[in-house]
């Protein structure tokens, strides 16, 4: 259980976010059956959040710091690292494993 990071393309290999950093990310979130439930790319605006502070799901708080700037990866988050038994009705069913294709654009 947890988060698995599957590399798609390398980043700079030296600029990694630390807890409390603001990160700018593009992402596409899907269920394991491939159904898309959210996408910053579709909105045309990257997502900005503070990492490691509980502002996002645990899978992101633990997975994003493993990425360096410019890296693209899949974060596979088990339910306990995503939305758990509640899910996020109506788009994410209870106990769903989620896949996020994430690109770390910037760390401040």
UniProtKB/Swiss-Prot annotation:
It holds the Pfam family FKBP_C. Residues 20-108 form the PPIase FKBP-type domain. Keywords: Cytoplasm, Isomerase, Rotamase. GO terms for cellular component: cytoplasm. It comes from the Eukaryota. Belongs to the FKBP-type PPIase family. FKBP1 subfamily. This is FK506-binding protein 1. The gene is FRR1.
């Amino acid at each position: 259980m947890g988060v698995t990071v599957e590399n798609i393309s390398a980043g700079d290999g030296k600029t990694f976010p630390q807890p409390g950093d603001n990160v700018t990310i593009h992402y596409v979130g899907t269920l394991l059956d491939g159904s898309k439930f959210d996408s910053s790319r579709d909105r045309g605006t990257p997502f900005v959040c503070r990492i490691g502070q509980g502002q996002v799901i645990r899978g992101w708080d633990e997975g994003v710091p493993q990425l360096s700037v410019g890296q693209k990866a899949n974060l596979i988050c088990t339910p306990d690292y995503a939305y758990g038994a509640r899910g996020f009705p109506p788009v994410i069913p209870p106990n769903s494993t989620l896949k996020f294709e994430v690109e770390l654009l910037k760390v401040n």
